[in-house]
């Protein structure tokens, strides 16, 4: 018990209480903003192996509960993740999963193929699963996603008749908007069977069969198809590629992008390279890795991509 308290004393951003069955401890100075209630002690060895997994799984089992302001509790611990203990060698299978085609398809399927109805419960009508773009303070999530796609399409400088590839096309809203507004010919690729089926349904529903196609395909198979596109876009998919495959991903883009073409890459980024959080990798995004901007720019140079524009949408993602 005391060892656990000593471990938790490293997290000092907010004052909080730690409660056990027969005892209570005050950590930090000032009035506590929340209480961590341990109904069952967590072995110190588990906290040292992975603080994230130990606390997260204890909460899932009901061995740990948060009383008071849950947002502040999450902000408190997640904002100090640099103080978490992570034994990367002991968590190798979680932290550094295989980036083979077979394994990445399995990881994508485990996240996206749990049913479109589930995603419809909390995504907006566009089924966009990435950062919105808020032009006005009172923009709804739907309007922010429409804004985002419109903004992306403008950055791509599309013209009627152009060909556009969307790598990781999701449920297809971006390509549908591009076809309707610019009369481009678009191709979307995804590894998710659920997204593939829904996108196909939407294409038929919108009468866009002459403009759009969607394929179940790994980006690594693109060069084999000998496709060539005027424009390539990828929104929120790079996080699934894996650090070992960033260069390969960009190589594949370079091979299918026509000379003088434009490539727009939208991704969640970190300031520095980091293997990621064990709990998130195990339960939310298997195989997911957040790249840094600097490493992606470095890889882009190897394929002679000239960076024309960089924009940070962090505040928009926070609101999304």
Task: Describe these PLM feature segments.
Residues 247-259:
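A short glycine-rich, Lys/Arg-flanked "PGG" loop and its adjoining helix->strand segment in the class I
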Residues 1-145, 151, 155:
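Feature captures hydrophobic
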Residues 260-268:
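Conserved beta-strand signature within the Rossmann-like core of class I S-adenosyl-L-methionine
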Residues 268-320:
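Substrate-binding/catalytic lobe of Class I Rossmann-like enzymes that use SAM or dcSAM, i.e.
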Residues 171-182:
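Conserved SAM-binding loop of SAM-dependent methyltransferases across substrates and taxa
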Residues 220-232:
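A short acidic, Gly/Pro-enriched loop at the edge of an enzyme's catalytic core
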Residues 160-168:
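Conserved class I S-adenosyl-L-methionine
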